[in-house]
């Protein structure tokens, strides 16, 4: 699938994981694909993880911030707090009203190549409440080699960093962990597949910022955000 928690060996090989690998060749990619794929992992009746190959690695880093946001939000709700925003690294849960007694305003950054994360220019602002929001993009964690850009989003189906027109994907869902996972998946899918998927799932809303043929920034919104 487009979202796969077994992608860690590939991320390491491309230099985006917890280990810094050398730039991989096609032979290495093919060998790593042999140990990539969620169908190679299952749960036993007593809840133990069963891997078809001991070299398979599981990494939930793509949803870690979203999960952490949900945990904090649940804690606040248990304490009886009804109006709040939790933000961890740009992944957000909002509940109730903001201090001005209106919907929460959440900005989406303009996806300009910015490895130092100093750009604060906004592409758009969402007005929402009682949702989880997550954004995934390829404009901060990347490098260039031989004049070609390689970003951190790895397609687990091919083993290579994605080369799509989508620059960032923002998802609104009932919880932040789900939004986080879908945002990553949409970055892997590419614009057309992501549009079809998002429009066919009315429980989600999504906003994609992409570059057209002239390199101009364009935006796609699901029907629920029109």
What is the meaning of each model-derived region?
Residues 1-226:
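Mature catalytic core of soluble alpha/beta enzymes
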């Amino acid at each position: 699938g487009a979202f796969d928690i077994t992608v860690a060996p590939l991320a390491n090989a491309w230099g985006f994981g917890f280990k810094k690998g050398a730039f991989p060749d096609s032979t290495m990619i093919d060998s790593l694909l042999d140990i990539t794929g969620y169908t190679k992992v299952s749960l036993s009746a007593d809840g133990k993880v069963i891997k078809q190959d001991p070299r398979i690695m599981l990494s939930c880093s793509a949803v870690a911030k979203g999960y952490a946001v949900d945990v904090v939000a649940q804690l606040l709700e248990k304490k009886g707090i009804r109006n709040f925003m939790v933000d961890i690294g740009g992944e957000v849960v909002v509940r109730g009203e903001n201090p001005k007694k209106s919907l929460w305003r959440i900005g989406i950054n303009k996806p300009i190549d910015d490895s130092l994360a100093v750009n604060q220019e906004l592409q758009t602002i969402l007005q929402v409440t009682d949702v989880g929001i997550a954004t995934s993009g390829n404009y901060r964690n990347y490098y260039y080699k031989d004049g070609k850009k390689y970003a951190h989003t790895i397609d687990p189906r091919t083993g290579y960093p994605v080369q799509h027109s989508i620059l960032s994907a923002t998802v609104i869902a009932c919880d932040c962990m789900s939004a986080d996972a879908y945002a990553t998946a949409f970055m892997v899918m590419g614009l057309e597949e992501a549009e079809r998927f998002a429009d066919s799932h009315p429980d989600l809303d999504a906003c994609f910022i992409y570059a057209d043929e002239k390199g101009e920034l364009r935006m796609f919104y699901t029907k629920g955000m029109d």
